[in-house]
Amino acid sequence: MDLTELRGQIDEIDSSIVDLYEKRMDISRQVAEYKIENGKQVFDKAREEEKIRKVKSQTHNEFNSHGVEELFEQIMSMSR
């Protein structure tokens, strides 16, 4: 496989990530609206900590685990 093909695969993955990110943000907005309407706090530290543990457990090495932790901390911060 050459560099162009590898970059093409990365481009496809990146497009999927963008689509999934936008879907996640829309659902997060709905969750926040629900919480506000029902008098709940939007920020749920326990839920975020559990989410971080779960996604880190899905990785295959320490490097990816650290990257996924940073990624999801950022995603969750932006979706509050």
Locations of regions flagged by a protein language model:
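Domain-level signature for soluble enzymes in the chorismate/prephenate branch of the shikimate pathway
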Residues: M1-R80
